Amino acid sequence: MSSALIIGDGPGGLSAALYLAKNDIETTIFGQDETPMHYAMLYNYLGIPEMAGSKFQEIGRQQATDFGANLVDASVEKAEKTDDGFTITANSGDTYSGKYLIIATGPNRELAESLGLERGDDGAIGATREAETEVENLFVVGRTTRPHQVQAII
């Protein structure tokens, strides 16, 4: 069982994975190469001044795994709350468990909604500044928490 499961390997998911792994928290991140990140231009994420989304994803994945994060090249089809935390099912059929779950799926909010989170009037999933939701140990980061695309400043 991982301590933290992260669904999504865009800027939000990779940032979370990097900081968790740097702090010796067992982290598993799920993502695929098929992503709109390839068309993005990012500024000042992970200490990188400016870079295309494809290169950012490559470097972010490498940084996170260098610090011990486990990267699973898969999409997640199902997420469930359990007594011990969360269990997710990848498109391969494999299941993974963790105490904490971070959803960083961009504008796709279906997994968040399947866990009981609701969209606000603006269409975004609500979370505190610390990314906490009303579901214990469930966090939501990145565009999942915003109604439209913006540039975050870190």
Where are these regions (language model features)?
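Beta1-alpha1 glycine-rich phosphate/pyrophosphate-binding loop at the start
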Residues: 2-55
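Short hydrophobic core segments
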Residues: 5-7, 95-107
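Hydrophobic/aromatic ligand-binding patch that stacks against planar heteroaromatic rings
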Residues: 15, 19-20, 101, 111, ...
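Residue-level detector of anion-binding/catalytic polar loops
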Residues: 26, 70, 118
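N-terminal Rossmann-like dinucleotide/flavin-binding domain of flavoprotein oxidoreductases
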Residues: 38-92
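FAD-site-proximal beta/loop scaffold in flavoenzymes
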Residues: 108-146
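Short, glycine-/small-residue-rich phosphate/pyrophosphate-handling segment
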Residues: 146-154
